[in-house]
A protein has these predicted regions:
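Terminal substrate-recognition subdomain of acyl/acetyltransferases
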Residues: 100-185
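Conserved acetyl-CoA-binding loop-helix of GNAT-fold acetyltransferases
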Residues: 74, 80-94, 118
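A conserved beta-turn-beta hairpin within the catalytic core of GNAT-like acetyltransferases
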Residues: 61-69, 79, 98, 143
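Short amphipathic alpha-helix that is part of the acyltransferase structural core
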Residues: 1-31, 157, 161-165, 169, ...
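A short, internal acetyl-CoA/4′-phosphopantetheine-binding micro-motif in the GNAT/acyltransferase core
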Residues: 72-79, 106-108
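A conserved beta-strand-loop-helix scaffold within acyl/acetyltransferase catalytic domains
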Residues: 23-73
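Alpha-helix C-terminal capping segments
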Residues: 6, 47-48, 88-96
Length: 185
């Protein structure tokens, strides 16, 4: 299994995958994704084994010991075959010098049994890979109730401070205030 960097010519096709793989309200607009790649705020790569099988978009500012997994998906034809776990191991190895942070749907906010079960399944998937839910944090990100998960811990910073430092370069202060609400308690 290998990775290859996403190049500028692939931004539109990548975004087509993102529209298929994520709910509309979890997607940044295309211009924002493109801008963040162009400004080197985002790092993106495909997981490949003779054919692209999935992708990840990461925010990893050089001056921080954190990285945010913004988007992570396995293409539909490769799901439920163990590739997601393998791809996540690649991400963990690639960013082994950092604490990785991600958001997952909050199971307690699910409105149906099906969405609850799906949210629980995703949280358990990340827990098997070594992530844990930060229990003292609740988040509403782009209107979605999320849990914040990390594969490490920093006693000196709150989840809100960590997420602020990761999202601010990508969104700017105005958008951060509009779309991100993280409560540490």
């Amino acid at each position: 299994m290998e990775t290859r960097n996403i190049n500028k010519e692939e931004y539109k096709s990548l975004y087509s995958h993102m529209k298929r793989d994520f709910p509309h309200n979890e997607l940044q607009p295309f211009f924002s994704v493109k801008r963040n790649f162009d400004k080197n705020i985002y790092e993106g790569f495909y997981f490949t084994e003779n054919v692209d099988m999935g992708y990840a978009i990461i925010t990893a500012p050089e001056n921080l010991k954190y990285a945010l997994i913004n988007y992570f998906a396995v293409f539909p034809e490769f799901r439920e075959k163990g590739y997601g776990s393998e791809f996540l191991k690649i991400i963990l190895n690639r960013y082994s010098d950092r604490i990785l942070v991600l958001e997952a749907d909050d199971p307690s906010a699910a409105k149906t049994t099906a969405t609850h079960d799906e949210a629980v399944r995703r949280v358990k998937f990340y827990e098997r890979a070594g992530f844990h839910v930060i229990p003292t944090t609740r988040a509403k990100i782009f209107g979605m109730n999320m849990v914040i998960m990390a594969n490490g811990q920093d006693e000196n910073l709150s989840a809100k401070e960590i997420m602020h430092s990761l999202y601010l370069p990508a969104l700017g202060a105005k958008q951060w205030l509009r779309f991100i609400d993280i409560i540490d308690f």
